[in-house]
């Protein structure tokens, strides 16, 4: 599939991953990488957020300043959800944090697959900002590729599902 043929955010991300990442899980062309996090059982919904945050901080500590974390959450024995979390070190200490597919994020926070998920998410965001000197943003997508940015801009013009300001911010990086 060509980038111009992508018709959804998920397809754009899949294109980005498939064209940037080698079989070893690290990009051979630049430092953008995908890191796979273990499958997480449906009874530990809040822990998947915790795991993603911990993974980002661990990777930053190792000097890997940007990438996409991918993890799957098992909903049942036959169904799972995959989440893509792009992250980047910004201004020395900031991470841009976003669930690319807002529908999946909405599922976690509203269906309450685990008691207290909403409160746990709030706690993690608050403590993450304070303890790690990072600012969690759920309104921006960080994908540092000009082609991807242009494609997202086209997608916005056709679907109006992502903020134009956010896209302009991305494309100016």
Each model region followed by its residue ranges:
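A structural boundary/capping signal
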Residues: 1-173
């Amino acid at each position: 599939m060509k980038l111009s043929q992508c018709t959804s955010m998920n397809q754009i991300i899949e294109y980005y991953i498939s064209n940037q990442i080698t079989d070893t899980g690290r990009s051979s062309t630049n430092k953008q990488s995908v890191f796979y996090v273990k499958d997480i059982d449906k009874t530990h919904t809040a822990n998947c957020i915790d795991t993603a945050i911990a993974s980002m901080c661990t990777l930053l500590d190792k000097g890997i300043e940007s990438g996409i974390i991918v993890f799957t959450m098992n909903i049942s024995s036959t169904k799972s959800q995959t989440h893509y979390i792009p992250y980047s070190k910004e201004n020395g200490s900031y991470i841009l944090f976003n669930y690319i597919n807002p529908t999946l994020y909405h599922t976690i926070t509203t269906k309450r697959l685990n008691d207290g998920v909403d409160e746990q998410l709030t706690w993690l965001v608050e403590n993450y900002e304070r303890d790690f000197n990072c600012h969690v943003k759920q309104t921006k997508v960080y994908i540092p590729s000009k082609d991807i940015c242009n494609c997202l801009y086209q997608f916005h013009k056709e679907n109006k599902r992502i903020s134009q300001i956010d896209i302009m911010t991305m494309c100016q990086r």
